[in-house]
């Protein structure tokens, strides 16, 4: 009585499973589900780097639900592929009807991403292209990230430059097919991603030609590739101007590389 008890919450960090771990998890969650003979969990495990155990469980559950809705007696590769797409990008927007012209534009946009990605050296292979609206996206191009890159979290300058070119491939395709005046707002998220990657290359990863191997700004939070974070400025206006200039140059080079493809 009268004593104080302090309870401190502990946080346990669980790493995302590697290929072997994903294969085992898929095997566990496949129990009780009737899979078609040509469904290979080994291939599914290789297509899902970065997935958590919960993601994998959700994937197989979604595939089983899709099979039931389609009045199928077993889960086929089609249901697996559709479930992967759903887990990655959200449910299909069935109420969003696209005109033939819009569908064609989205197809060109996504083909631009895929083509640039396929022709960039040592880039992630294209897994699937879809023009089915999901979430806020009119279409999506899926790449299969390298297992080694995902596990190590290490990305080279060349890879990041390729990534920016691939992200700009959709807008470039629109410009080539429809002309500069008909480029749409569909590349908005792509442009944000490219700008974020370029800025991190300069201010976080020490990949600046002008400033050298330095990290600028005191980050507030963890580092996630492709996601901008808040940072306290600890550099001058002159340095800020140099950063903006280099970011612009990196984006311009990436756009030209995508155009040349």
Model-derived segments and their meaning:
Residues 55, 112-113:
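Short hydrophobic/aromatic residue motifs in ordered secondary structure
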Residues 103-108, 114-261:
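Soluble catalytic regions of large protease machineries
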Residues 1-7:
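Short, small-residue-biased leader/transition segments that mark boundaries at the very start
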Residues 11-81, 90-91, 95, 167-175, ...:
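Conserved C-terminal "switch" segment of AAA+ ATPases
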